[in-house]
């Protein structure tokens, strides 16, 4: 095994005059199956193509894109493992100081909107050479979409980038067919019948049979109700059984999304996972400090794809789909056994998971032939009676992994759906999880405690979490284990008022939880929650939703989740006053915060000093964030 060439010298050493494909990525080159670029490049290599990797090229000049010369078939472009704007900016739009997908965690090695920038550099260097885009950034931006950083609706990234074809979702099937047809002389711009792809065509061209139309780019840019309806239609057509082609007009062209690609079978998923990856970053990065993103996944196992949880704020369903596909035990055992021959392996498998760790089968029997339901979720607000809850196969897999010579411990660190676990009366899985697979803490994701907010999130109500907490504590006590359940929580999600944030603070106090880090809702492309953030409308119900968009209000909601910190007292008091919960300011056991001098002065009797207008002013109920000075007008 060896890394694919990332320099002209490495390509020449292989005896190649030119590459068939040059794969351009916004990440450093890490040859590991947790990284999308590694999967696609190794897949193409296994099919006989010569593939060079252009990782994090300079973006101020087209010089780097000519590093390998003109590829024989074309360029493949990805922004990297995550959206380049998410890689660069926090939820508060502040520039990040670190990039875990770059050598030495160094920020700034990829451009904003990397896919678009790379495509334009390629066009500048090579004119009309074929370009196919894919990866998460392209996949989630395939339709006209609200862009949080521009605070405006942008067109499909296919139109913006000037590429010939877009692959959405997990791209193995699509890439295999595209490469074969390109090798046969067909340009990708002419490929209009491949599932899991998007293309652009003139308005006069025929459209796919049974295609459905959503509102045009111009219309969704101008009217928020229209945007919300288009969002729902797009989300409803992402099932590989029932999904239809979706058409969206962009100026004088149609954007056409073909139906989703078929999921990989177990045999295909095994084959992809067992391609000859180096499972590490390229040695060129060693002197720069390596690539930090490898640390958590180097000795982890991914056993499934897809997620039928389908939370509204999560992009997994829009990218991987809701249908569960899994790898075989034999394949996973072979991968784990190979760990034991790695000199860096200390005997600990860090995780056995995927989008959701404890999903080993589709949620119900009908999905293979009828697809997943369009109008309801499997687990929220309550679990569908048709959902099959069975951890038998996962328990057996974990037992087999524990038995491998050289493996000391197998951890399951995250991605467990506790609501799914609560559908099974048998305690075997949770008991073995507690006994063997948790290192001190188990992290799960209730996200909030307010029923209204959880409904907008597409999550089960908090009583399910509290029932799981009691069950977890009972089993820990029985097993003699001192373990802790750590909840992931989110502030400022659409639907969350200041009173909801106070309710969440009281939930933390009740359960003696003090989170050191707080996650603010991040409006990323391709999710129903981002649609709510932009439009103030729930696309599933078309009902209005309160949206906390004012930066200061979001700060107050976030601060309430750390109400106990002395430095937060002034903000917590202000939040409680705004919420009409001054009963929680005081010295009693049920209070969240003690009054400070400013608060006491503001509450003096008339004639002894007036109230502080900052504390008594009522917020505008529909207040939205002020327009950003850096917003780009389209």
Predicted features and spans:
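N-terminal [4Fe-4S]-dependent radical SAM core
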Residues: 1-18, 28, 225-300
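Glycine-rich beta-alpha loop elements in corrinoid/cobalamin-binding modules
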Residues: 10, 36, 55-250, 257
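Conserved SAM/AdoMet-binding glycine-rich loop
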Residues: 23, 58-59, 337-486, 490-494
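N-terminal pre-triad scaffold of radical SAM enzymes
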Residues: 24-29, 288-315, 340, 348
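Terminal amphipathic helices with adjacent charged low-complexity linkers/tails
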Residues: 60, 189-239, 252, 261-264, ...
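Flexible glycine/acidic-rich beta-alpha junction loops that bind and position SAM and/or redox cofactors
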Residues: 83-92, 140-142, 172-177, 201-206, ...
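Conserved, mostly hydrophobic/aromatic
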Residues: 164, 272, 307, 311, ...
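Acidic, low-complexity intrinsically disordered tails
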Residues: 376, 595-634
């Amino acid at each position: 095994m060896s890394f694919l060439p990332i320099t002209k010298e490495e390509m020449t050493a292989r005896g190649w005059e030119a590459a068939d494909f040059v794969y351009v990525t916004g990440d450093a080159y890490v040859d590991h199956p947790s990284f999308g670029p590694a999967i696609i490049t190794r897949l193409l290599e296994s099919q006989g193509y010569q593939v060079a990797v252009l990782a994090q090229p300079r973006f101020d000049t087209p010089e780097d894109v000519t590093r390998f010369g003109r590829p024989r078939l074309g360029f493949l472009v990805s922004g990297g493992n995550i959206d380049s704007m998410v890689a660069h900016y926090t939820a508060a739009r502040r520039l990040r100081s670190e990039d875990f997908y770059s050598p030495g965690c160094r920020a700034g090695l990829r451009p904003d909107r990397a896919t678009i920038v790379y495509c334009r550099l390629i066009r500048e260097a090579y004119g009309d050479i074929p370009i196919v885009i894919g990866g998460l950034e392209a996949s989630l931006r395939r339709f006209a979409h609200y862009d949080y950083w521009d605070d405006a609706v942008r067109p499909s990234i296919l139109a913006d980038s000037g590429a010939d074809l877009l692959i959405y979702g997990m791209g193995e099937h699509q890439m295999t067919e595209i490469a074969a047809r390109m090798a046969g002389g067909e340009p990708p711009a002419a490929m209009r019948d491949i599932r899991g792809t998007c293309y652009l065509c003139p308005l006069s061209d025929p459209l796919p049979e049974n295609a459905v139309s959503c509102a045009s780019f111009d219309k969704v840019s101008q009217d928020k109700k229209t945007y919300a309806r288009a969002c729902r239609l797009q989300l409803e057509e992402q099932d590989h059984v029932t999904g239809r082609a979706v058409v969206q007009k962009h100026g004088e062209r149609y954007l056409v999304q073909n139906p989703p690609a078929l999921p990989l079978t177990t045999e295909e998923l095994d084959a992809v996972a067992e391609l000859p990856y180096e499972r590490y970053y390229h040695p060129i990065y060693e002197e720069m400090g390596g690539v930090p993103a490898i640390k958590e996944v180097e000795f982890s196992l991914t056993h499934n794809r897809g997620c039928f949880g389908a939370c509204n704020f999560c992009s997994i369903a829009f990218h991987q789909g809701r249908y569960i596909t899994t790898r075989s035990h034999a394949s996973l055992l072979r991968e784990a056994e190979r760990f034991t021959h790695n000199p860096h392996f200390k005997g600990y498998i860090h995780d056995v998971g995927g989008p959701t760790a404890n999903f080993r089968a589709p949620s119900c029997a009908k999905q293979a032939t009828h697809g997943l339901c369009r109008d309801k979720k499997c687990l929220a607000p309550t679990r569908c009676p048709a959902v099959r809850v069975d951890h038998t196969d996962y328990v057996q897999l974990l037992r087999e992994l524990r038995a491998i010579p050289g493996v000391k411990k197998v951890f399951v660190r995250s991605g467990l759906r506790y609501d799914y676990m609560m559908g099974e009366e048998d305690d075997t899985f949770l008991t073995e999880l507690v006994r063997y697979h948790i290192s001190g803490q188990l992290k799960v994701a209730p996200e909030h405690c307010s029923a209204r907010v959880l409904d907008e999130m597409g999550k089960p109500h908090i009583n399910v979490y509290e029932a799981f907490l009691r069950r977890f504590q009972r089993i820990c006590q029985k097993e003699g284990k001192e373990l802790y359940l750590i909840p992931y929580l989110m502030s400022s999600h659409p639907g969350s008022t200041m009173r909801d944030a106070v309710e969440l603070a009281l939930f933390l106090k009740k359960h003696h939880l003090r989170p050191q880090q707080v996650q603010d809702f991040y409006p990323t492309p391709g999710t129903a929650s981002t649609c709510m953030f932009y439009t103030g409308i729930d696309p599933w119900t078309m009902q209005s939703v309160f949206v906390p968009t004012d930066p200061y209000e979001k700060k107050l909601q976030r601060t309430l989740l750390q109400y106990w910190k002395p430095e937060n007292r002034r903000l917590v008091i202000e939040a409680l006053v705004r919420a009409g919960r001054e009963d929680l300011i005081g010295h009693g056991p049920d209070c969240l915060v003690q009054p400070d001098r400013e608060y006491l002065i503001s509450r003096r009797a008339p004639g002894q000093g007036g109230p502080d207008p900052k504390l008594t002013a009522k917020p505008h109920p529909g207040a939205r964030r002020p327009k950003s000075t850096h917003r780009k007008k389209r």
